[in-house]
Amino acid sequence: MFKSLYKETEGFRLVSILTPLCMIGEVVMEMIIPKLMSSIIDDGVTAGNLSHIYRIGGWMIVAAAFGLLFGVLGGVFGARASTGYARNLRRSMYRNIQTFSFANIDKYSTAGLVTRMTTDVTNIQNAYQMILRMAIRAPSSMVIAMIMAFTINARLASIYLVAVIILGGCLVLIMSRASNYFSAAFKKYDDLNESVQENVSAIRVVKAYVREDYESEKFKKASGNVQDLLLRAEKVLSFNSPLMMATVYTCILLISWLGARMIVLSGATSFTTGELMSMLTYCTNILTSLMMLSMVFIMISMSAASAKRVAEVLEEESTLSNGENPVMEVKNGAVRFDHVCFRYKADGRDVLSDINLNIRSGETIGIIGGTGSAKTSLVQLLPRLYDTTAGHVYIGGVDVRDYDLKILRNSVAMVLQKNELFSGTIAENLRWGNKDATDAEIEEACKQACADEFIERFPDKYNTHIDQGGTNVSGGQKQRLCIARALLKEPRILILDDSTSAVDTGTDAKIRKSFAEKIPGTTVFIIAQRISSVENADHVIVLDNGRISGYGTPAEMLATNPIYQEVYNSQTKGSGDFDEKGGDNNG
């Protein structure tokens, strides 16, 4: 963990070193001042020596000025180091997340990753700045003040030593207890963020079903869990300040009483008034340093859980990787599944079992099955969004695990069930498929996807701005734009995962006809609930609970497969889309 976190200090190590050095310089200047003050009182005021007062007073001003300079520089360097460190952490986390497979994403959840990149990194940033400044300043101040106090009077200085040992032990107990609560609280932050994210992204559904009160209670519960744990931590930490103040005042009283007795009994020969003033100042410095150190421990205990969570993301390796000599070209779209089994979790059940398929390049394959029959799981194995649990998937005669991952995914285009558009113009969204696509190529792809029909009606046409998530276009328009974006990749394999469900049957037919005419060499997989979407496919795969129930032409399936027959009959009689009884939502 420490190695991965230390690596992110690169570029800011010099200021990270200069910050504590400046803090030490500030402490040295502060520790000189009480000694000079003692000299002014004993050798200047008591002796009536004005020249000594002016001379030592001048040195005090110089020491104070240098202390101020070191303090300001330490603050500037510390801020630069901590903000730069946080920037490096977020950048490296984001870069590593981009390499994650779907399995890695499933492990952390989107809300969890957001929390780690925001709240957790901010905690680490604050702790890093405090460590660079206070974690060096406080011990340095305490040690130097202790040494100076012992040079004045070892008997009185021993009071400080006892107080430091007692307080140190109490701090360890307080911090260890509070750290456990903070660790649990940050885990609950994931649930809180997930609740917010889910509610905001589905706000239309929430309002449509009048579920505002339910969602408010759900958020209240998640927020209450975080509050409860943080409150417990704060209750433990609340002992810190009273304990510190009680110790400070006790030490001041003891030193004042014992010091006054020594001055009176010795006649100010073995112990002077100036030395007593210095001892009281050093007492305050020592115990204030200990208080600052306790604040550092509090911040460390808060950030320790965050540091662990951030390090997990930094050290996480994608479950997918290239081989030693990856294949750099996908020759064609021929697909073969060889005894493929797949499960999402190592200890879970198989969602795909013993899948065997042999599909020629350029064929159009329809996939039919009820919810939970693993239709989506099947096609996600083609671009290696997941790896098989057992068996092999071949594209162009080569195992998908032998391809360079980027080359493979550039050869497979997917239009997912949940279509995503990004804020920007229509043209900018479409160029996700091919960043170098010309205007003519964009227009041609839109014609194939029947998207040109509505784009031409917009005043700004292809420069029309799309809101985040595509909220200013309809579901059918969004689907057609996503299909056009996929076509711009000129893929060997095109996967349409229920991607025409929001368009009318006439437009659906036009899109399929365009595929047959414009991209005859591309292997097309069409996952659909509507029989009309797959009736012209070369072959149809019928899935039932992760197993192939039937495979053949649409006519053969209609004649021999009960599931296909039920879908066909339910729709031709006007019953709407068929949804076979299923289990988990893997379809």
What are these model-derived regions, one by one?
Residues 21-22, 29-42, 63-110, 114, ...:
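Juxtamembrane helix-loop junctions of ABC transporter transmembrane domains
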Residues 49-53, 144, 148-162, 169, ...:
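Helix-loop-helix
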Residues 11-13, 99-103, 119-132, 136, ...:
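An intracellular "coupling" helix at the cytosolic face of ABC transporter transmembrane type-1 domains
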Residues 328-587:
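ABC-type nucleotide-binding domain
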Residues 10, 16-73, 77, 150-155, ...:
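Transmembrane helix-loop-helix hairpins at lipid-water interfaces of multipass membrane proteins
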Residues 47-48, 83, 91-115, 119-121, ...:
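Short intracellular "coupling" helices and adjacent cytoplasmic loop segments at the cytosolic face
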Residues 1-11, 113:
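A short amphipathic helical element positioned immediately N-terminal to and/or at the very start
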Residues 11, 15-28, 39, 129-185, ...:
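Transmembrane helices of ABC transporter permease
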